[in-house]
């Protein structure tokens, strides 16, 4: 059986791993397979392939979907402080998700499974919504979730799909035709770290503790929103530090462990394809200090009329502040541009299997 390493859709440098090609293939001959860095790329069984061209047609890097025009920008806080405390920023995603669930729809987003891997899942009850809440700084596995979303839309139910901008692009290209029952929320994305690096970190912490890691909190707010910590728990021990000091997060935030395509994101700077974009509203303590209580504020970019309608449906459960794109991007660089890959990135992945992540931090960042 002949298997080609990668479909020549976009170049490997540009491939986001969105998985639209694997979902659309009518013969199931495309598999998303991890490369030596741990990122998923498409592989095709050429003996099964009938050259239908569908995979090329749905590649969002070859054929970009139509973009929205930015309509409005807000700072926003969920009125429920308990929800806000367990959210990464201001808890607005939960309000959007609850609204769709109350309308009889389903919500799709990234969740941690029993092995602490990150993958996209469907949620159809408010009780299960917490698993989607909060940032997960690992590229999530899409699997066949686009296919499941299409089936639900065809059944006439609403779907709120959340993910990175490239995942939203992949979904929309896969669906081909727009659906009034589909609402999309993307997150302003610094880049997606390698699952291989993430699991290496979990394994090294487990070795140090003598027991497995059982819980991960990427953005714990016990010390406040701005001083948030990244924490890893075993049954008896806790590991972690502020997000700028923790080993795994340092590699991520310094653009060492992220996917190659993230160095030149095609979907930031008002190029989102989602109805709503959400992010941390960093710097609001300087711009609007009266609005900041260090419990978290969401930057909300409304990109479509459907997004505006969804925000209107939840506005009575939130506190909103009108702002603009320039202010929202002033202290959150990822809103408006990508940061280049770290010059030490190639060295990092070349020697990843030889050293611990702590040793790699010393070699690459100190």
Where are these regions (language model features)?
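Gly/Ser/Thr-rich loops at beta-strand to alpha-helix junctions
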Residues: 88-91, 114, 161-171, 191-193
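Ferredoxin-like iron-sulfur electron-transfer modules
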Residues: 1-19, 29-51, 214-215, 244-253
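Short, flexible loop segments at boundaries between secondary-structure elements
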Residues: 183-204, 331, 335
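Local cysteine-cluster metal-coordination motifs and their immediate loop/turn environment
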Residues: 13-28, 50-62, 164-170, 258-270
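Flanking helices and flexible, charged tails adjoining ferredoxin-like Fe-S electron-transfer domains
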Residues: 1-4, 47-155, 321, 325-366
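A short alpha->loop->secondary-structure connector
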Residues: 128, 176-187
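Long, compositionally biased charged/polar accessory segments in the mid-to-C-terminal portions
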Residues: 103-106, 211-366
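Iron-sulfur cluster-binding cysteine motifs and their immediate structural context
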Residues: 20-37, 41-43, 53-70, 275-276
